[in-house]
């Protein structure tokens, strides 16, 4: 009988020691285990390569090392990126772009002044036909200058939207995989269709439908000011309203669907996880509680990795859109300022055309901002996914 008791006590302490060893896992151990997962490791390597390739096109992320950033975030709770260097790069970029757009502003103002002088000279000679020829000659040069800068801005906006889409296509599979491995199966199942729509369809809607509508409104502004008598103001306003309605509708539907489905799925995952942990705690003798706590610890570390990747993703997303926003904001401001400066001295049709071009630039800027907003919200939903695991 005594031997049996000794054997039972030995087994009990032996099992407890094993459970303790399994439960205590260091951060480096968890990171190593995640790096050994083939799917996650493959996606991470692809993401690192993609970010390194982006550095040739986006100079603001030259100082970002994705591998070191994630390691620093996991160990210290924050990345190792120097925001002072980023700020210095942004200021340098702004000054460089200001020099460029000031040349554009100077060209516009000179043409407006020249048009005004020619008109005054021809009015003094009482020759309407020559005056009209001089006006249309200056107007044509103005159209060429504004169109060149606007087409460059359209190209920048398209590249920004496609760049955001490509980056999201690279980082979202990793985040979704980690959420699924952390127990958020229902959340992944509901987010997958939304992510597919966001990454593949929404950028095409903007590039192939909304931006061409903005280009049409830009062209119609010049047609509207060709004549002082025949106007198409209502058509210009209608096209602008359509572009705004399309953007507002897409944002509203996307965010509402994402929020509702995310809340519902996270609730289901929370109930499932608590039920599973309760079953492990109560139906597995001796080691059930330790095993349940070990699962929570491992999953908690996986969420830290997810948050590190999400933090880096948000930072890169901001850096991707920063240059296009700075460029388009400055050009739009120059258009508006040029229209204001030339209004007292130039023909009303000239200033109206410049102001209309500025309004079209604002619509172009809204495309980048609305696409960025949707992906920001998607990032926020994914970053908050899995919090029930730690609290559950």
Model-derived regions, located:
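Mid-bilayer segments of alpha-helical transmembrane spans in multi-pass integral membrane proteins
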Residues: 136-149, 168-185, 205-214, 218, ...
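Helical hairpin unit composed of two closely spaced alpha helices linked by a short loop
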Residues: 307-348, 356
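Alpha-helical membrane-inserting segments
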Residues: 114, 118, 122, 219, ...
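Juxtamembrane helix-boundary/capping and inter-helix hinge elements in multi-pass membrane proteins
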Residues: 127, 228-232, 343-351
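Generic multipass alpha-helical transmembrane bundles of integral membrane proteins
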Residues: 191-312
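Membrane-helix cytosolic exit motif
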Residues: 327-335, 339-343, 347, 362, ...
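Gly/Ser-rich, low-complexity
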Residues: 1-112, 116-135, 149-159, 163-164, ...
